[in-house]
């Protein structure tokens, strides 16, 4: 498997893990289809994700790969906007967040990151 293919496979597997973790806690969660420049995130939590619809950008960086909180949260914001626009929803009803895999740890040890301004309507 090429490096690019292995990275994509690791990312897809992590998205499934995240979706299944939320489902096991009775959240309505789905993986979202890739849409290129109009991508809408990796996983959607349909209701009551800290009072909103959650759009999750899932990241599973490999060993030696940098963690880019600023870039990833910006990506989540853009994709949340795409999700809202495609469905005619107010952006205020969407909470963009990033889920980052903790290497060598269980899914419950992943990190959930969002901007304070996104949570508190900055």
Model regions and ranges:
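Catalytic phosphate/metal-binding cores of nucleic-acid and nucleotide-processing enzymes, i.e., regions
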Residues: 1-122
